[in-house]
């Protein structure tokens, strides 16, 4: 099992949660294919909207990749099903020194520019607890 951090503005995250899907890096297939059923997924949203949204810098949704193959939507974008759990949006700032992904890295924002990053179980568990989604790690 792997854990993924996907970087998407909050408005798109909320739409994905509503639809029960994940779509990464503008809907390309490669990122979606790396995910497998049971993988953890957490969204980080630097802004509320893109490109004109307000700064946010929060983890905005969390769940697990569902047992369904990726599919291409009617608009040509690749998606996977996700089972999201209720969670509270959580700022990243208080966690920067605790997360293996960002600890000791002043330029952690550059990592996020990749759009999809594999994260450790430690980081996924910490984020899940902070978001009140402990059921994902129990």
Model-based region annotation:
Residues 1-37, 131-138:
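Compositionally biased, charged N-terminal/linker segments
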Residues 115-138:
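Charged phosphate-binding loop/patch that engages nucleotide di/tri-phosphates or the phosphate backbone
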Residues 55-122:
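Aromatic- and Lys/Arg-enriched surface recognition patch
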Residues 10, 47, 86-88, 123, ...:
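A broadly conserved detector of short glycine/acidic/proline-rich loop/turn motifs that flank catalytic sites
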Residues 12, 49, 71:
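Surface-exposed, flexible loop/turn segments at secondary-structure boundaries
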């Amino acid at each position: 099992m792997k854990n993924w951090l996907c970087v998407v503005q909050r408005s798109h995250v909320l739409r994905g949660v509503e639809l029960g899907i994940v779509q990464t890096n503008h809907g390309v297939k490669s990122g979606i294919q790396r995910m497998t059923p049971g993988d953890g997924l957490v969204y980080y949203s630097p802004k509320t909207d893109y490109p004109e949204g307000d700064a946010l810098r929060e983890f905005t949704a969390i769940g697990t990749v569902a047992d369904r193959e990726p599919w291409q939507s009617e608009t040509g974008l690749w998606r996977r099903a996700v089972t999201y759990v209720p969670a509270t949006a959580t700022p990243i700032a208080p966690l920067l020194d605790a997360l293996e992904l960002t600890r000791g890295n002043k330029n952690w924002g550059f990592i996020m520019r990749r759009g999809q990053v594999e994260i450790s179980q430690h980081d996924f568990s910490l984020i899940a607890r902070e978001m009140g989604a402990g059921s994902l790690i129990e």
